[in-house]
Design a protein with these regions (language model features):
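Short, surface-exposed "cap/lid" segments of acyl-processing enzymes
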Residues: 127-173, 180
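Alpha/beta-hydrolase active-site loop
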Residues: 186-208
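N-terminal cap/lid segment of alpha/beta-hydrolase-fold proteins
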Residues: 88-132, 387-388
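N-terminal targeting or regulatory segments adjacent to alpha/beta-hydrolase or S9 domains
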Residues: 1-108, 401
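Catalytic histidine-centered segment of alpha/beta-hydrolase-like enzymes
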Residues: 381-392
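Short beta-strand/loop motif that positions the catalytic acidic residue
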Residues: 340, 346-348, 352
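Acidic catalytic loop of the alpha/beta-hydrolase fold
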Residues: 350-355, 384
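Alpha/beta-hydrolase-fold enzymes
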Residues: 19, 24-25, 29-49, 53, ...
């Protein structure tokens, strides 16, 4: 018994030390981001883009492929930094009370609520330069269970605003971040979120300080971005190109993948446990606003007995009045790549454990006859870790792409 108690005490001590290290890292990073932001803040305009008549997606992508990439899958410090900066926030984001509390935006950003096309209110942080010079804008979207306050999102937003000179909007997609406190419409794996992004693009395009609007998203935000690009003909507010980082082709296949327990040795296993934990936290939170007795068994289910496929079947698809099959069809970007009429760059990593690289085979096939869509596969990058493995490469690709497609 003494040995057991001693072991438990050691585990608790180790957990407290790990939590202290993570919290210290987050606070230090927050301070460093603010310091860098104010050091870079200039107010100058982005570099002028190419002549509109000379712009060509194929030649641009070939140029971006030549940007030196130093990222390696064995970059343990970069991977550890990304995990520390973002994993703790994902757990906080799972509940309304704690979502978006870390990494607040600086005072140069205005907090607004915009309305998606189905009436869903969405929280956003908007950075508009005050020098009176109209300039292009970028809408930046987080991934599943994330928020606009995730480290990689806010760091990208602050860099785009202060260093590249863009206007910026960081969005909390429906049911995530502060948006989950505004309405309880469930997430749709990118289907309705694509319209959230286009509503954000509409909001920015109506600002007199904005000349064109690009969209970029990560993971589920990437799927949302790909779907938004396909809908840009119907919602003509995406005028400055789009980049999707670590997206997917088939939403049903992806939700099944993250809901299926992998072997202990699989790199995805710790992420799977994290998803399970976040789903459990989210279900506990949902008890505060769902009182349907038929859903109680789902909400009360244990850590390992309910998953995201159940969420789609019992919560999301019924809420939007569609079958599960129609839900997945609407949320699968590969079904709509032939419809994309705006420049869309899809960046993916060969070693992505969450959205497997094989997903891109389906995207490439679906977009084979569409010159507006290009897929750029990188040898490493894990899942949305490009910024931590090679920030110089990541910044260059992002800045050069959106500068190229910006209009004035």
């Amino acid at each position: 018994m003494r040995f057991i108690l001693k072991s438990i005490r050691r585990l608790i001590e180790a957990a407290l030390i790990a939590a202290a290290v993570a919290l210290g890292g987050i606070l230090a990073t927050h301070f460093w981001m603010r310091l860098k932001f104010h050091a870079l803040l200039q107010g100058g305009a982005p570099q002028s883009p190419a002549n509109v008549e000379d712009r060509d997606m194929t030649s641009l992508v070939e140029r971006l492929r030549q940007v030196p990439f130093k990222g390696k899958s064995a970059n343990i410090p970069g991977m550890a930094k990304g995990a520390i900066m973002n994993s703790f926030l994902l757990a906080l984001n799972a509940a309304r009370a704690t979502s978006g509390v870390m990494y607040p935006y600086p005072e140069e950003f205005e907090h607004v609520v915009i309305e998606s096309f189905d009436g869903t209110p969405l929280a956003a942080a908007v950075g508009i330069h005050k020098d009176g010079i109209p300039r292009p804008a970028i809408v930046i979207s987080h991934g599943f269970m994330g928020s606009k306050n995730d480290h990689y999102i806010i760091d990208t937003a602050l860099t785009a605003y202060a260093e590249w000179g863009f206007n910026v909007l960081g969005i909390d997609l429906r049911n995530f971040g502060r948006s989950q406190s505004l309405a309880h419409g469930p997430t749709t794996a990118g289907w309705r979120e694509s319209e959230d992004l286009l509503a954000a693009a509409k909001y920015m395009s109506e600002r007199p300080e904005v000349t064109s609007v690009g969209i970029t998203g990560f993971s589920m935000g990437a799927g949302s971005t790909m779907l938004a690009a396909a809908k840009a003909g119907e919602f003509p507010y995406l005028t400055g190109g789009a980049i999707a980082w670590n997206g997917y082709a088939d939403a049903g296949r992806m939700i099944s993948h993250i809901s299926t327990r992998p072997p202990l040795t699989d790199p995805f296993f710790p992420v799977y446990l994290g998803f399970r934990l976040m789903h459990k936290i989210r279900r506990e939170d949902m008890k505060g606003y769902i009182d349907d007795p038929e859903l109680r068994p789902y909400l009360d289910a244990g850590f390992g007995t309910s998953d995201f496929t159940t969420y789609v079947e019992k919560i999301s698809a019924p809420h939007y009045g569609v079958s599960t099959e129609e839900f997945y069809r609407n949320a699968s970007p590969a079904n709509f790549m032939a419809d994309v009429e705006v420049p869309l760059l899809v960046v993916h990593a060969e070693d992505d454990p969450i959205c497997p690289a094989s997903e891109m085979d389906f995207v490439i096939e679906a977009a084979a006859d569409n010159p507006n869509v290009h897929v750029m596969m990188m040898p490493a990058g894990n899942h949305c870790m490009f910024r931590y493995l090679d920030k110089g490469w990541y910044d260059t690709v992002m800045r050069d792409f959106f500068t190229y497609w910006a209009t004035w």
